[in-house]
């Protein structure tokens, strides 16, 4: 017996008419509504629709992550017309709660929700550290589990142990959800796994046939076991109970593997490349021996590659991007042979590997493409002593969140001249990329990211290459902007970055097919530069101070720039920090021969006369800032968006001067419906502009692993969210 149910929603607060679309987020306990009505059956979370009662049309909506764990959560949509106040949330009951399926389209709401591909076809999903395929829900389908790192959607827990539930027969999955634990059996006080840099593995440690978790938090010399209780939360996810903690040689991002390495029938651990034997012949509780360094690396996984019955070791030669997967033959005991290559067309840029089985197919999960992708490779044989792996699937989801590796700061632009906004991003590992929108501005549909070429080769910006150095912090961290720098009518690629130089690539293509010439450095009058001078900057940086004072260079390290015509002469300028870490206007002009030149025009100031640095907002740690230009208030003057790492705060500095001489108002911290928006430590370096097409500028932020929280104009200007009245449910049998 199935019931069609409807819950009326009426917006009761006055709504502004001049702020564009307004997010509405309504918390509903569907399970309680069904119980209170005395209906048979349970809530079907996949059946939700939202109807605008005034227009009679279905409103696109989003569901919060809460529905992965319970029958209560938030349903979110955008009020496009403030005069439309009446809505209905419609849904159906089911005999049993079905698995939560991904939505085929999730609209941008604007209250910190995350940008999604919305391509109508599955797109890649990522994991940060640790990964396995295990059947957590008992439906016979291996789910993709592992760890997240740092922040995700604003307001959600940091890092943690996560799962993408399997939703089909192919290698496709649902939305990311978090695994939770309780302190004692029977408790329902759910907790999230602690820490920022964390490791986990998944196996049946106590022999009850259920998947348990072993977990490590970096810098703690211990691991903790969390046993699967056999009970589930209302969403059908297993409840884990915190159990024993044992000493282990944990290191920062070091690897944690549960494996019977010595073949005695019970699970051991390999932690940070050290073998920790389980001396309990019954397997549980785990009785650790003293750790033994295997001497073959840290991030290890084990699988019988050559069919001799012994578990061989797989790993990577070093940390970071650009590594090829290798294996070492098990020679018996704890001895392993030299590194050997693995056949099978594996990507050459692996960053993590984990032995896993997908049903009856044995193989490995491989993380690749600068941490962005996870693929399953099946072990397909071992001809001539050389094991071969065959790729069987790329982990994807129909509702995948756009996630583009380390600190890929965003810039929306019309890259290919088709009238719709694409997404240009930077990247911590040096590669700027373009994410093309094959949909419309009203309903974007994004392609996977593409590398950007210069003279036929992918553009990559790294500290050591620019500064001829060998520094431990050899990163890129570009803050890309696509803007017509040289006045020829074509957008050029501007790349402030990790260093105290700004590089750019001139567009030598067309408005619809951008192509880029060789790398150039922005030169400023009075600041001569050369390879020798750049090498001198590289030598200034020390291990403890990667961003030193460098008086001979006009720009500061790792700072984004606000490109606009700041002095009203029709030429492109920019504001960024100079070598003294003060916001400075760098202006272009034409010399007597008509050639474009760049000069340091001077520090810009607040209306009270102060120069602009992080002292105006009281930040204590001085690293990583960015500026963006946007006419936030629609008065025709370009304002300044200022964001800072460490706090993750974003500020508006209104231009209260003129188009020729900008002067900025005191900083106003952006808040989402009155609440602070600090949602990252290393960012957010937001892009500012009209993202949702309502004619009002918005903010698109970014977190460490480059998911993109979206804040619309109305949410940033209103002191509180719209109030609404949730009325009693009605229903009918169908």
Residue ranges and their predicted role:
Residues 138-148, 207-217, 263-272, 307-316, ...:
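Acidic/hydrophobic-patterned starts of short beta strands in beta-sheet-rich repeat architectures
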Residues 102-125, 165-195, 227-251, 277-296, ...:
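Blade-edge motifs of beta-propeller repeat domains
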Residues 1-114:
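Alpha-mannosidase-like glycoside hydrolase catalytic domains involved in N-glycan trimming
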Residues 128-136, 196-205, 253-261, 298-305, ...:
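Beta-propeller blade termini
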Residues 423, 685-734:
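Blade-level signature of beta-propeller repeat domains, shared across WD40, Kelch, NHL, RCC1
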Residues 218-221, 244, 248-261, 265-276, ...:
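Solenoidal tandem-repeat scaffolds enriched in leucines and small polar residues
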Residues 149-154, 219-221, 276, 318-322, ...:
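Short glycine/acidic-enriched loop and turn motifs that connect beta-strands
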Residues 120-151:
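Beta-strand-rich domains and repeat architectures in extracellular enzymes and scaffolds
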């Amino acid at each position: 017996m199935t019931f069609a149910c409807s819950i009326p929603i009426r917006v009761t607060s006055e709504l502004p008419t001049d702020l564009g679309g307004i997010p509405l987020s309504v918390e509903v306990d569907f399970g309680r509504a069904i119980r209170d009505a005395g209906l048979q059956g349970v809530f079907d979370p996949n059946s939700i629709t939202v109807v605008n009662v005034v227009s009679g049309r279905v409103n696109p909506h989003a569901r919060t992550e809460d529905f992965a764990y319970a029958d209560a959560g938030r349903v979110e949509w955008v009020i496009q017309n403030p005069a439309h106040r009446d809505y209905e949330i419609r849904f159906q009951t089911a005999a049993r709660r079905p698995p939560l399926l991904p939505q085929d389209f999730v609209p941008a709401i604007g209250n910190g929700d995350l940008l999604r591909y919305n391509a109508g076809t599955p797109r890649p999903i990522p994991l940060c550290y640790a990964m396995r395929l295990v059947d957590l829900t008992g439906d016979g389908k291996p789910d993709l589990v592992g760890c997240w790192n740092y922040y995700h959607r604003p307001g959600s827990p940091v890092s943690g142990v996560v799962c993408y539930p399997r939703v089909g027969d192919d290698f496709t999955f649902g939305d990311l959800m978090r695994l939770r634990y309780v302190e004692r059996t029977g408790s329902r006080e759910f907790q999230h796994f602690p820490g920022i840099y964390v490791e986990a593995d998944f196996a049946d440690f106590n022999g009850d046939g259920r998947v348990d978790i072993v977990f490590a938090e970096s810098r703690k010399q211990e691991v903790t076991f969390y046993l699967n209780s056999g009970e589930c939360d209302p969403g059908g996810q297993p409840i884990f109970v915190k159990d024993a903690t044992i000493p282990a040689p944990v290191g920062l991002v070091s690897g944690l593997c549960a494996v019977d390495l010595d073949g005695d029938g019970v699970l051991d651990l390999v932690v940070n490349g050290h073998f920790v034997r389980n001396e309990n012949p019954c397997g549980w509780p785990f009785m650790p021996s003293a750790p033994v360094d295997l001497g073959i690396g840290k991030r290890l996984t084990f699988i019988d590659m050559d069919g001799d019955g012994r578990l061989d070791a797989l790993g990577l030669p070093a940390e970071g991007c650009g590594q090829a997967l290798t294996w070492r033959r098990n020679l018996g005991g704890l001895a392993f042979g030299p590194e050997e290559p693995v056949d099978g067309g594996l990507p050459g840029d692996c960053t993590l590997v984990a032995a896993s089985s997908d049903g009856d197919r044995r193989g490995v999960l491989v993380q690749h493409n600068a941490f962005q992708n996870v693929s399953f490779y099946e072990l397909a044989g071992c001809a001539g002593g050389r094991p071969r792996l065959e790729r069987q699937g790329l982990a994807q989801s129909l509702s995948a969140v756009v996630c583009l590796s380390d600190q890929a700061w965003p810039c929306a632009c019309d890259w290919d001249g088709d009238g719709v906004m694409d997404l240009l991003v930077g990247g911590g590992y040096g590669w700027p990329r373009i994410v093309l929108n094959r949909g419309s501005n009203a309903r974007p549909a994004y392609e996977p990211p593409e590398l950007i070429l210069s003279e036929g080769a992918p553009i990559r910006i790294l500290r050591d290459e620019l500064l001829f150095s060998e520094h431990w912090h050899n990163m890129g961290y570009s803050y890309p902007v696509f803007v017509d720098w040289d006045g020829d009518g074509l957008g050029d690629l501007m790349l402030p970055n990790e260093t105290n130089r700004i590089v750019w690539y001139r567009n030598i293509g067309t408005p619809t097919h951008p192509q880029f010439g060789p790398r150039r450095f922005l030169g400023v009058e009075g600041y001569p530069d050369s390879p020798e001078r750049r090498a001198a900057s590289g030598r200034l940086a020390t291990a403890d101070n990667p961003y030193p004072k460098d008086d001979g260079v006009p720009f500061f390290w790792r700072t984004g720039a606000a490109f606009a015509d700041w002095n009203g002469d029709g030429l492109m300028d920019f504001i960024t920090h100079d070598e003294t870490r003060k916001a400075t206007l760098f202006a272009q002009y034409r010399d007597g021969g008509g050639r474009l030149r760049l000069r340091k025009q001077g520090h810009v100031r607040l209306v009270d006369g102060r120069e602009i640095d992080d002292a105006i907002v009281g930040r204590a740690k001085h690293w990583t800032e960015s500026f963006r230009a946007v006419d936030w208030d629609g008065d025709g003057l370009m304002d300044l968006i200022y964001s800072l790492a460490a706090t993750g705060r974003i500020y508006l500095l209104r231009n209260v001067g003129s188009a020729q001489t900008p002067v900025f108002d005191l900083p106003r911290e952006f808040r989402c419906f009155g609440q602070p928006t600090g949602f990252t430590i290393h960012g957010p370096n937001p892009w500012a502009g009209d993202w949702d097409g309502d004619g009002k500028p918005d903010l698109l932020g970014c977190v460490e692993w480059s998911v993109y929280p979206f804040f619309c104009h109305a949410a940033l200007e209103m002191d509180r969210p719209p109030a609404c009245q949730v009325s009693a449910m009605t229903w009918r049998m169908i």
